[in-house]
Amino acid sequence: MNSSSLLTPSSSPSPHLQSPATFDHDDFLHHIFSSTPWPSSVLDDTPPPTSDCAPVTGFHHHDADSRNQITMIPLSHNHPNDALFNGFSTGSLPFHLPQGSGGQTQTQSQATASATTGGATAQPQTKPKVRARRGQATDPHSIAERLRRERIAERMKSLQELVPNGNKTDKASMLDEIIDYVKFLQLQVKVLSMSRLGGAASASSQISEDAGGSHENTSSSGEAKMTEHQVAKLMEEDMGSAMQYLQGKGLCLMPISLATTISTATCPSRSPFVKDTGVPLSPNLSTTIVANGNGSSLVTVKDAPSVSKP
């Protein structure tokens, strides 16, 4: 029948098969709608099942011809064909995305990243704590502690200046000197206050107890005379050094009138007076008197019979 004409399409006229030069849009559309939508089936050599009654060889030849014609279409010179081909290739994808969706997704991801970065930079960054150098602490507790130590050092320096010959650098030794000096001042204040209140006898006993408790009695006249000269010299040069020396010897300064009252109250039956001083002597007391220009005298009361004169 028509098998020969189908096998040789170039010799027989066919309304559907034309040369590439006379290819029109109707044939192209007919080929598109009659073929499968998958691109892989277009490139496959096996012909798809159709309801056409034409032989397989004829269809295969027709399909090869159509593929050749499709590849020979100049897409750059025919804009309607370009649009149609683009629509075919895009529509044939089963999971295609609309045009511009990739760009929109990329733009959205960039916007999200920029927003995240901007939020991170907007947060205030905590500066690392710089460790202060030694002596320059910035912590309030450390500053208060440093100020407290400075005040203690200043008070210790002022207290050291009040103590005669308080040149100790060790705090413990300096505090020992301060304690001894304060005890000496307490003894002197007690003696002077008792003389003012008229308790000469009690003052004499208090002096004997306090001064003789920690020091040995001076029994030799030579040692007493040396003490007198040393105290007189110190009182002329440095009163503070003299007070410290007296403290070490268990002596204290008191007015001559107080010494006279103490001696009279201790032994009222016998009241011999020391020449040029008017201080009575008692056989039970060892009295050392050193007069100075201020009208005061140095008196020590101890249980010893020796008496010395300036």
From Swiss-Prot:
Region called Disordered, residue ranges: 1-23, 95-143, 203-225
Region annotation Helix-loop-helix motif: where it falls in the sequence: 150-185
Low complexity: compositionally biased ranges: 1-20, 104-126
Disruption phenotype: No visible phenotype under normal growth conditions. The triple mutant lrl1, lrl2 and lrl3 exhibit very short root hairs. The double mutant drop1 and drop2 fail to develop sperm cells.
Subcellular localization(s) per the UniProt record: Nucleus
InterPro entries from the UniProt entry: bHLH_dom, HLH_DNA-bd_sf, IND-like
Keyword Transport: no
Tissue/organ expression: Expressed constitutively in roots, leaves, stems, and flowers.
Gene Ontology biological process: microgametogenesis; pollen sperm cell differentiation; regulation of DNA-templated transcription; root hair cell development; root hair cell differentiation; root hair elongation
GO cellular component: nucleus
Transmembrane helix in keyword set: no
Top-level taxon of origin: Eukaryota
Main location: nucleus
Molecular function, one GO term: DNA-binding transcription factor activity
Region called Basic motif, residue ranges: 136-149
Induction: Repressed by heat treatment.
Keywords: DNA-binding, Nucleus, Transcription, Transcription regulation
Annotated ranges, domain bHLH: 136-185
Function: Transcription factor that regulates the development of root hairs. Transcription factor that regulates the development of sperm cells.
Complex and partners: Homodimer.
Protein name as annotated: Transcription factor LRL2
Native organism: Arabidopsis thaliana (Mouse-ear cress)
